[in-house]
């Protein structure tokens, strides 16, 4: 635990931020895309930071449970992301090409599947550039190849389990720390709302800060780790 960390039985205060145990504010799960077969993986690396993903650039929570448990964003032998999944209307994009030949970056070109009668197959091109340089950076470019306007939902889902490499390889731990949620006080004293955009926050607060997503974990030694 650092000198800037204060704790109560229900809250953790760290560098001006407030965390509470994740079970106090459960987040509705966003369905993952189930693949009928095990997906090949690509790996990019920068010093002690490495990223194992499928060829689309996704880390699917379903894949972790169905044959690819080693995928994720890792640093210092800990997995800081166990889900990073881009979906088109709840479906996986269709891969056209991907390469990780540079070693520290991943380039992906994919397109959209057919979505009922609203979106024809291969109407939209999606280019993903994922780079490791002390952190993970991603740029997404979306191109419309039709002659008309199209409407569709493009989503990216994140999650972090903060397991170590031994757990990834199948070893069990007798005890684990706890997952945390970053929250902000609401106008009503004693209540909190999620900063992650799932629950509304006070209007004056939302306009004064950048939109962000923070996933956190408190280890058995009291230290707090964050994925931001």
Where are these regions (language model features)?
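Terminal accessory carbohydrate-recognition/targeting modules of carbohydrate-active enzymes
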Residues: 1-228
């Amino acid at each position: 635990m650092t000198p800037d960390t204060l704790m109560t039985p229900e809250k953790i205060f760290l560098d001006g931020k407030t965390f509470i145990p994740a079970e106090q504010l459960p987040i509705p799960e966003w369905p993952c895309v189930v693949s009928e077969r095990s997906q090949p993986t690509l790996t990019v690396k920068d010093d002690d930071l490495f990223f194992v993903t499928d060829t689309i650039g996704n880390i699917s929570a379903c894949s972790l449970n169905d044959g690819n448990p080693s995928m994720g964003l890792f640093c210092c032998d800990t997995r800081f992301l166990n889900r990073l999944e881009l979906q088109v209307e709840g479906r996986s994009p269709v891969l056209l090409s991907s390469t990780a030949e540079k070693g520290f970056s991943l380039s992906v070109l994919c397109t959209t599947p057919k979505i009922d009668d609203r979106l024809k197959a291969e109407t939209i091109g999606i280019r993903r550039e994922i780079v490791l340089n002390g952190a993970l950076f991603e740029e997404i470019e979306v191109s419309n190849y039709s002659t008309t306007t199209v409407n569709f939902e493009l989503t990216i889902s994140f999650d972090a389990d903060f397991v170590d490499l031994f757990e990834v390889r199948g070893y069990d731990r007798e005890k684990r720390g706890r997952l945390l949620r970053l929250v902000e006080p609401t106008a009503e004293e004693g209540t909190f709302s999620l900063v992650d955009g799932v629950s509304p926050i006070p209007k004056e607060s939302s306009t004064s800060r950048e939109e962000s997503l923070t996933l956190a974990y408190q280890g058995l030694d009291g230290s707090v780790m964050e994925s931001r």
